[in-house]
Amino acid sequence: MSAKGAGGARGRGAEGEKIVATNRRARFDFTIEDSWEAGLVLTGSEVKSLREGNVNLSDAYALPRGDELFLVNCRIGEYKQAAHFGHEPLRDRKLLMNRPELDRVKGKIEQRGYTLVPLRLYFKQGWAKVELGLAKGRSHEDRRHAIAERETKREMDREISRRRR
């Protein structure tokens, strides 16, 4: 599935960043309280596939295992030209963070109701990075409220632009 299927826009972010995919679903399903940047341990065919935008973050999350953090359920599609040197699309991928930062993140994840979800995947100066958000699940009422707010804002913007004409 391409980056568009992952709910994200491809293009340039901040200086030196090339956005591969964004997880728009995460911002709808969860309340994001904090975010961190982490590097990814990838194989060559995974990097090539990412550069083509062949990634899906919609069901992905990060999970601590021992003293390490892993990205689980992130689908990086197979790179066609890799043939038998390819990779497994749904394998768990190790995340790279500084030790104090990793300990802080693990402490927050262990609190009840929190999870770590990828918000966007991008290349920064040639290195694959993922922005992780500390997320707390939203209730259905909160989701409906967010939709109502968004619709109200759209209507106000439409009315303002209509009056300017």
Swiss-Prot record:
Highest taxon listed in the record's lineage: Bacteria
InterPro entries, A to Z: SmpB (IPR023620), SsrA-bd_prot (IPR000037), SsrA-bd_prot_CS (IPR020081)
Alphabetical keyword list: Cytoplasm, RNA-binding
Keyword Plastid: no
Region (Disordered): 141-165
Family designation: Belongs to the SmpB family.
Name by which UniProt lists this protein: SsrA-binding protein
Species: Anaeromyxobacter sp. (strain Fw109-5)
